[in-house]
């Protein structure tokens, strides 16, 4: 399944903590799309994926104010 989590209103480290909490509730092969603002530390999600044994499927700019990170459990 695919899930989405809008974290644009949050500042670091809350997006990382929220993503970690959400991933705990997902099944293997589920995907989690994270919507972040540019103030979020989006580069940290590469490290986060490695440390939490999840795949970083994709990262891209959705607009000037939103960055998308897709993780797969």
UniProtKB/Swiss-Prot annotation:
Active-site residues, Swiss-Prot/TrEMBL: 12
SUPFAM superfamilies noted in UniProt: SirA-like
CDD domains: SirA_YedF_YeeD (cd00291)
Family annotation (InterPro entries): TusA-like, TusA-like_sf
PROSITE patterns, alphabetized: UPF0033
Family designation: Belongs to the sulfur carrier protein TusA family.
Protein's name in the database: Putative sulfur carrier protein HI_0242
Originating species: Haemophilus influenzae (strain ATCC 51907 / DSM 11121 / KW20 / Rd)
């Amino acid at each position: 399944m695919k899930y989405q989590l809008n974290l644009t209103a949050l500042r670091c480290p809350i997006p990382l903590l929220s993503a970690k909490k959400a991933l705990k509730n997902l099944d293997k092969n589920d995907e989690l799309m994270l919507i972040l603002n540019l103030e979020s530390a989006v580069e940290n999600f590469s490290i986060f994926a490695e440390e939490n044994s999840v795949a970083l499927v994709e990262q891209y700019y959705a607009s000037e104010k939103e960055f998308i990170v897709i993780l797969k459990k």
